[in-house]
A protein has these predicted regions:
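Long, contiguous internal "core" modules enriched in hydrophobic/ aromatic residues
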Residues: 1-194
Length: 194
C-alpha cells in the first residue's frame, strides 16, 4: 500500500543519512593514514611517481583525475599554495589528497606498488591483508556515492562486493550464508571499521 511505500522511502532516507555520517569518519581516517604512511615512506609527491605503481596507465588516469579535482577546488589552502609556489605543479600529498574523492583515493591505494606500506595501513584498521582493505574501500566508495546521490540503499545489490573473511581480529559477524553482493555486507564492514 502507499503508506508502506512512504514508510520504506523514509526509512531509506534515514539510513542514507546515518551511513553518510559514519562514512565521513572512516574516509577521514583512511585519507590521513594513506597520506601519512606513503609520504613518510616515499616523500610528499609519491602520488606523482609512476615508478611506485603497478599499472602506469591507471597511474595516468589517476593523475588526470587529481589534476581535474585540483582545478575545480575552491579550497583556501589550495589557492594559497598556488599563490606562493609555481613548482611543482601539484601541492604535496597532504594538501592535494585532501581534496580528491574517496574513489580517487581508493584507486591510488589500489595501484600503489609498496605492499608493505599498504599492509601497515590495513593493519591499522585491524584487517589482515591490503587486498581486503582495497575491496572494502571500493565497496565503501559505492555506498558513499549512493548516499551522496540519494540512491536507494534498502535491498541494494553492490557492483563491487567486499571481501568477507570468516574471522577478523575485532568483533566480526558470522558470514555463513551472507550474500556479500548485498548492501548488508558493506554495512558489516562499516560496523567493523568503527
Amino acid at each position: 500500500c502507499f503508506d508502506d511505500a512512504v514508510a520504506l522511502y523514509d526509512f531509506d532516507m534515514e539510513l542514507r543519512f546515518l551511513m553518510f555520517k559514519v562514512i565521513q569518519r572512516i574516509e577521514i581516517a583512511l585519507r590521513s593514514d594513506i597520506i601519512h604512511e606513503f609520504s613518510v615512506c616515499h616523500g610528499p609527491f609519491w602520488f606523482l611517481d609512476d615508478t611506485l605503481v603497478d599499472d602506469v596507465q591507471k597511474f595516468k588516469e589517476n593523475r588526470n583525475a587529481i589534476e581535474r579535482e585540483l582545478q575545480r577546488s575552491r579550497e583556501d589552502f589550495i589557492r594559497e599554495h598556488r599563490l606562493h609556489y609555481d613548482e611543482p605543479a601539484f601541492p604535496p600529498a597532504w594538501k592535494t589528497l585532501e581534496i580528491v574523492s574517496l574513489g580517487t583515493l581508493s584507486k591510488l591505494y589500489y595501484n600503489f606498488k609498496d605492499k608493505k606500506a599498504k599492509k601497515r595501513i590495513a593493519r591499522r584498521f585491524n584487517l589482515p591483508q591490503h587486498e581486503v582493505l582495497e575491496s572494502w574501500m571500493r565497496s565503501l566508495t559505492v555506498l558513499r556515492n549512493c548516499c551522496a546521490h540519494h540512491s536507494r540503499l534498502w535491498n541494494r545489490r553492490l557492483a563491487n562486493s567486499p571481501q568477507m573473511k570468516a574471522t577478523l581480529r575485532g568483533a566480526w559477524v558470522d558470514i555463513a550464508g551472507l550474500d556479500n553482493n548485498k548492501v548488508y555486507a558493506i554495512f558489516c564492514c562499516v560496523a567493523y571499521w568503527l
